């Protein structure tokens, strides 16, 4: 399927209309007609990394040059361990060296780390410049490029420093997924499964039937998975941009998952891998609280297993998990707020989880030594 599909993120209820479009399809990197309305000064900074630059940077720069758009590239090291102040300053250095002005947009060409760093730089440089997301991983196309969360990690906690700052446009070129390593593809599927679990039981059913086609990168299957994921996220973000309510449900599995990433060291586990194990922990806790059935947890585990994702966390002591989870962004009045499942297709927040049940989950859901 080569037809382009579009999803609107409606953010027009505030003083200024910050709505934008997500375009999904094949070979969108060269669809400069989609980019030009957001390049008023005919100059742009392209932020990418050492992995993506050899694959797609010149393709994008050449297409822009044909329309007289001047660009320069900022090539960052690749990896979650580089999502920090030092790497962020590399972007600021380049923007200042090229005397970029407030109308100079930043284009994020890469995965979630590139997008988060570029967005935070755009939110901060000159107190705000435009930016565009061109995500090249499945995880970024279905999740991190949409919704305006930007930021960096701190040694004590993931994504603890950042800003809400919306892109002007998202171009999800599914053709870039052909060069994505299998491990990265599976990590992105973890976030796709999340959308079915929190919001759409029919989508979860569809994923059960189409997992092998997704893993085989069938274009039509992939485009539908991306579109449906973006539709769900756009709907939730439009209702709650700054995560004061329903948007927190998008963090299913992330309280446990961030603890895994932080404790094991950024980059040891891919974000999607940690979310997968964390989602199984959340499902186990939901079962112990009698919110969902054993049959539900079995279905969830089987789907993650069929995607080739971890269903057990690393062997960290419950105490270390708890220590890391206390630094979660959703902590309120000192209490950890968990996203739990009420059924497949519906989730809710709970800040009254008994410590004993939580410890049981943490003991049951880690790999054997």
Swiss-Prot record:
Catalytic activity: 7-phospho-2-dehydro-3-deoxy-D-arabino-heptonate = 3-dehydroquinate + phosphate
Enzyme Commission (EC) number: 4.2.3.4
GO MF term set: 3-dehydroquinate synthase activity; metal ion binding; nucleotide binding
Record keyword Amino-acid biosynthesis present: yes
Cofactor(s) named in the record: Co(2+); Zn(2+); NAD(+)
GO cellular component, one term: cytoplasm
Binding site for NAD(+): 78-83, 112-116, 136-137, 149, 158, 176-179
Pathway noted in the entry: Metabolic intermediate biosynthesis; chorismate biosynthesis; chorismate from D-erythrose 4-phosphate and phosphoenolpyruvate: step 2/7
Signal peptide positions on this chain: none
Subcellular locations according to the entry: Cytoplasm
GO biological process, one term: aromatic amino acid family biosynthetic process
InterPro entries listed in its UniProt record: Dehydroquinate_synthase, DHQ_synth_AroB, DHQ_synth_fam, DHQS/DOIS_N, DHQS_C
Main location: cytoplasm
Keyword Nucleotide-binding: yes
Cofactor binding notes: Binds 1 divalent metal cation per subunit. Can use either Co(2+) or Zn(2+).
Residue spans crossing the bilayer: none
Annotated residues for binding of Zn(2+): 191, 254, 271
Keywords: Amino-acid biosynthesis, Aromatic amino acid biosynthesis, Cobalt, Cytoplasm, Lyase, Metal-binding, NAD, Nucleotide-binding, Zinc
Its biological purpose: Catalyzes the conversion of 3-deoxy-D-arabino-heptulosonate 7-phosphate (DAHP) to dehydroquinate (DHQ).
Family the UniProt entry places it in: Belongs to the sugar phosphate cyclases superfamily. Dehydroquinate synthase family.
Matching PANTHER family: 3-DEHYDROQUINATE SYNTHASE, 3-DEHYDROQUINATE SYNTHASE, CHLOROPLASTIC
Protein's recorded name: 3-dehydroquinate synthase
Record organism: Nitrosomonas eutropha (strain DSM 101675 / C91 / Nm57)
């Amino acid at each position: 399927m080569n037809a382009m599909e579009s999803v609107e993120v409606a953010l027009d209820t505030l003083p200024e209309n910050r709505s934008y479009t997500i375009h999904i399809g094949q070979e969108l990197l060269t669809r400069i007609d989609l980019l030009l309305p957001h390049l008023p000064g005919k100059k742009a900074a392209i932020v990418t990394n050492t992995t993506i630059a050899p694959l797609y940077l010149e393709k994008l720069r050449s297409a822009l040059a044909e329309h007289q758009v001047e660009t320069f590239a900022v090539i960052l090291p690749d990896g979650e361990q580089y999502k920090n102040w030092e790497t962020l300053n590399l972007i600021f250095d380049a923007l200042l060296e090229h005397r970029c002005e407030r109308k100079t947009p930043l284009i994020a060409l890469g995965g979630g780390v590139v997008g988060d760093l570029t967005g935070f730089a755009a939110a901060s440089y000159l107190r705000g410049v435009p930016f565009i997301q061109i995500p090249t991983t499945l995880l970024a196309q279905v999740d991190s490029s949409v919704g305006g969360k930007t930021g960096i990690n701190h040694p004590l906690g993931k994504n603890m420093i950042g800003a809400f700052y919306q892109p002007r446009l998202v171009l999800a070129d599914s053709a870039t997924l052909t060069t994505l390593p299998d491990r990265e593809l599976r990590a992105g599927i973890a976030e796709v499964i999340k959308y079915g679990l929190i919001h759409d039981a029919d989508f979860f059913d569809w994923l059960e039937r189409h997992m092998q086609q997704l893993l085989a990168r069938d274009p039509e299957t992939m485009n539908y998975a991306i579109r449906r994921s973006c539709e769900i996220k756009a709907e939730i973000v439009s209702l709650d941009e700054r995560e004061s309510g329903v948007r927190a449900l998008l963090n299913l599995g992330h309280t446990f998952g961030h603890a895994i990433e932080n404790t094991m060291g950024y980059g040891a586990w891919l974000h999607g891998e940690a979310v997968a194990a964390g989602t199984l922990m959340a499902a186990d806790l939901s079962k112990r609280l009698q919110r969902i059935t054993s049959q539900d947890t079995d279905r969830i585990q089987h789907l993650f297993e069929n995607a080739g994702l971890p269903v057990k966390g690393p062997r960290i002591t419950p105490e270390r998990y708890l220590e890391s989870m206390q630094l979660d962004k959703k902590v309120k009045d000192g209490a950890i707020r968990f996203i739990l499942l009420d059924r497949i297709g519906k989730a809710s927040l709970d800040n009254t989880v008994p410590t004993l049940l939580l410890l049981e989950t943490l003991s049951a859901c880690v790999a054997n030594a």
